[in-house]
Structure formats: structure tokens, C-alpha cells
């Protein structure tokens, strides 16, 4: 079996950036043929189209499907982005070794067998008969190249997904198999590969530059690119040679409108078929129409108010606990979100590995909040809550309600500062904790469905987005990183969640719902991980 050694990845670097890339978790979770300018390699090119495309609206004998999101992609390189919307757009054309069903379970992808070896490595057996959109066969060397391009910064690009596959130390191939070794033991290797690691063709990538790769596509997925208008629309046609059968959709288009009201109006005008993030106040208008309905699902995203432990008054655990008692999250879910949310009490969502069912939410108790503020020594504190504008479902309205409730305490005043997400995320992801905001409304998506992928990046001392340093919590998370017994690992993560609840580095808010408007002409079910898979849609 031929082998090549790869560069060593330091384990503390993995702890620092564990989980999905920072911007993905915050922003996120989620191809191609034709006569493009690619000169005959089967890729779509620039603004050219061989498939006609569609601006949306299903009808007639041709199944045309339009999807309208809040934002477009940042380019079509599936390994060079860190946003959920880009993953949705590229994920129609590219796919990984493993996949997930809509409930989050791990299923086969480009690999139809997978196993852990005695030394802790993981081995994937590739399915036969898979071809790229240009007609070339998928090989184990393509998979090896793709993993290395993501993980190692000297293989073409510095990928923002560098740590998404864990502490990879070596990738070897042989006889239709790919073996991935790690620096230490990786207990969630298969979870990571079920969410990350889109595969590209090595020769195609090496032949073209970054600009070309970001405007064209050559994957193995169910759809081929037919037209790409940067920032405007992406059009696809079915991959008739797809290994799992061609999708029913004949013409797929993905576009965006940042205004939720505009998206809803397009849906009701039958100009598109699926729209994302329908505001709760628009739900009744959609449901009462004759052309569309609401389809919602509890997502893998948690919303919270993050407090930096090293600045006053948030340096006091009592003050942080007081903020949890000061915010009436249940009322916010009912009145601001129209019930589209679930109360949370810990960083790990129900159904994810490590969730602790014994932890109860902090009760809304302004008197207790005022008492704890007095005990903290920070009576009279003046604080400012920063919130993104339009990134999460009703984020500004949620933040305003929370700030008002805190401000109503007799011994704390709270103001609200609204910020564009593109600006705020730069501060939140600053390399040093000293440069991060003090008090911020944020969301985090955990597409791996494993508690460590929220706890480690957000709350460990070396976490990429941490606002906390606690030796006991660090010890638990490091133990969870290396424990091979799955039951023991669950116990460790449950203990870590209890400690995080008690330390109260966040005001624990809610589990966000994904609320979609869906045309009555189609049948389509949303997923918990926020990925949109049009290949599962059917005509009514």
C-alpha cells in the first residue's frame, strides 16, 4: 500500500479551533457540466449557461425549483469558505465520504464502508462507479488530495476549514481505500467526516487557478452547474450519471434577498419555491395563502448572550448568573418568536451527544437577579449588549427585549448596540480574547451533533471563540477528546455541561428554529442542520 507522510498537527491547535470553523458555526450549520468557459472539461463557466435555468416557480412538465436565501455564496470552491449559505450552494455539486440524513444520522456518501482500525485511524472504502461531472472516475488519490488540501496549508490554499476534520496527521491510499490517521485519538472522526470534507478532482484543481475554481464546478454531486452569476444567481441541471440516481428536479436555481419581506413576497407571487428564515410575524400570511405553507424544524443552532469572563462586571460569576435570571426567555420565545424556539439551559442541545437532561433553565426572577448583582459588588453597572442585524431569526428584536429586561433591574442599566454581522464577526473571531466584545448576542450551529463541538470552540481556554478560562472545564473537555469509551465520554460531557451552566458564561437563550416558506406545488422537508437538499423535493 503506497503511503506518504503529512505534516504534524499540534493537538492544542485542534482544541483551539475544534468544531466547525468559527464563521461557519456563527453564520452556520451545510454539480458540473456544460459548455462553460472551461474549454471542454465539463464545467459550467462564468455567466454562460447550457441548461436554461430558472428564476424559480415550479410548473408544467419540467420540474423547475427556485430557492431564495438571505445571502449568496462567497465563491464555488467547496474547501475555501466558511459560511452556511456557500455550503448550501456548493453542496449541490460536491459531496464527502459520509453524509447525514435529515435527522442527523450518519449515512454513506462517496464511501459505502467505514471502520476504525486498531491504531485509532479510520478507513473508508470508496463506492464503485462514481464519476465527476467531467466524466472522469473518482479515485482514492482524489480523496487523499482533497483531505490534504483542507487540512494542510501547503497544499494549494490556506483553507478556513483546516481543523474541521480533526487533528489529521497522515492520509494513505490503496486499492479503493483511504486511511486517515490522527495526532492522538479522535473520538468523533466519523461525525466530522459526515459533515465536512467535500471531495474535488486533483487534476482539475491543479489545472486551474483560484478564480476559475470559484466560478466553475466539477464535483460528483446530484446537480451540475449550468450558470454562475456571482452575487446574483446559481443555476443547476441534474447529474444524469449520479451514483444514487438523477434528481427529479430538471432546473434548479438559487438566489438571495437580504430582506425577509421580499423573500416572502416572491414566494407568494410564485416567483420562487422555497424561502429561508420567514419571520414569525409573516407565518400567518404565508399559511393563509393558497400558494404556500410554512415548514419549520428545530435547528442545530443555539442562541445565547455571550459574556466575557475577564472584564467587569462579567468577571463575577454571580453577576453572570444574575443576567440569566434577569431575562425572561420564555416570554421572548412566545411573544417575539411566536413559539418558534426551545428553552435552553446548557451549551449542548437535546439530542446531541453529551446533553444533560437533569439541567433546568435559569428561572426568570428579577428579584433574585438584583440580589445576585448586589452580592457581586457591581450594583450600578452599565453594560451594552451588541447584536447582529438580520443574521439570526429576529435577532434585533430578541436582543432589544433582553436588554430592556436587564435595564429594568434597579441596579443595572443596559443599552443595545446594533451591528452589521460582517463587522461584528470580525471582532468575535479576533485571535485574542482581549479584542472580543464584552456582551454579545450570537448563534452557534453544531452540524456534528456532538456537545464537544460547541463546548470546545466556545468555552475552552484555547477555544477559537472562547470567552471563558476555567481549568476544571478544560480538564473535562480534554478528557472527552481522548476517551475511547463512548458511555464514559457522554458522562464527561454531561458533567461539562453542568459546569458550564453553573459558570454561566452565557445568558442561555433558545434553540433556533429554521422557518421556511414552501410552495404548495412541491413537497419538501427541511433538515435540522440547515442544509437545503433540493434533490429530495418532489412535485405535488
Predicted regions and their residues:
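Ligand/substrate-recognition segments at binding pockets and active sites
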Residues: 65, 374-445, 459-461
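Aromatic- and charge-enriched surface segment that lines or borders ligand/interaction sites
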Residues: 113-155, 313
